Amino acid sequence: HYAEVIKKTLRIDVNRVPGAGAAGGMGAALMAFLGAELKSGIEIVTQALNLEEHIHDCTWVLTGEGRIDSQSINGKVPVGVASVAKKYHKPVIGIAGSLTQDVGVVHQYGIDAVFSVLTRIGSLEEAFQGAYDNIYRASRNIAATLQVGMRSQG
């Protein structure tokens, strides 16, 4: 394996570094030969967008991706956004094209509620064709529900 060659030659163990790649991929090469530091994608996006400032000033956070499931806890955007939001005690709602049976695990990682944007069963192509309308409708309904809740509180 490439990672073993790096370890033997350079005395750098990239085998257990998240993001280095299976058995030493591109991430491992950049670390070993160029001294690169690996960062998660959400960490880079958070910094580039100044996400903390935006979240600090909001009432609640809406985030999403194509599918929210147990894999979402492994560095995907919704859980990364939720992590920032929870620093400021903001409620987080996730939306996705699909949810799986194991989606409940994301609640342990800061996502308070999750919703699928799909209104009917169809093909992947149909889901993509209706994506704008489906996301708009789901977001509007979530916002309306939040407004109802806020009005009922006084």
Would you name each region that the model predicts?
Residues 1-154:
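N-terminal loops that bind phosphate or other acidic moieties
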